[in-house]
């Protein structure tokens, strides 16, 4: 798996903005990506030292359109803890 295939997009929410000030960055990642692959991808793409990586599965929600019910797709989220004094500049400006 290529590094650009592992990290799909940053998650930009109020909670992720609060975590960013603590040196933690939230990313949407590939469903089959492991912690080691995520750590290597973030290091290669952004040039930072990753101390820790927390991964969780976000389950899809039930949605209803008129009389039909369905589900949204689930996805995988990673919270990456960056070494003290380092930051991902691209996300700081977002």
UniProtKB/Swiss-Prot annotation:
Matching Pfam families = Ribosomal_L23
Please give the Gene Ontology molecular function terms for this protein.
Answer: rRNA binding; structural constituent of ribosome
Ordered alphabetically, the record's keywords are: Ribonucleoprotein, Ribosomal protein, RNA-binding, rRNA-binding
Q: Which GO terms describe its cellular component?
A: ribonucleoprotein complex; ribosome
Q: Name one GO biological process term.
A: translation
Q: Which domain of life is it from?
A: Bacteria
What job does this protein perform?
One of the early assembly proteins it binds 23S rRNA. One of the proteins that surrounds the polypeptide exit tunnel on the outside of the ribosome. Forms the main docking site for trigger factor binding to the ribosome.
What is stated as this protein's family in its record? Answer: Belongs to the universal ribosomal protein uL23 family.
Q: How does it assemble?
A: Part of the 50S ribosomal subunit. Contacts protein L29, and trigger factor when it is bound to the ribosome.
- Record's protein name: Large ribosomal subunit protein uL23
């Amino acid at each position: 798996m290529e590094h650009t295939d592992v990290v799909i997009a940053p998650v930009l929410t109020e909670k992720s903005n609060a975590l960013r000030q603590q040196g933690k960055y939230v990313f949407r990642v590939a469903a089959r990506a492991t912690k080691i692959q995520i750590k290597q991808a973030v290091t290669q793409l952004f040039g930072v030292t990753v101390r820790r990586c927390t991964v969780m599965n976000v389950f899809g929600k039930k949605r209803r359109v008129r009389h039909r019910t369905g589900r949204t797709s689930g996805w995988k989220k990673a919270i990456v803890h960056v070494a003290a004094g380092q930051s991902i500049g691209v996300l700081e400006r977002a």
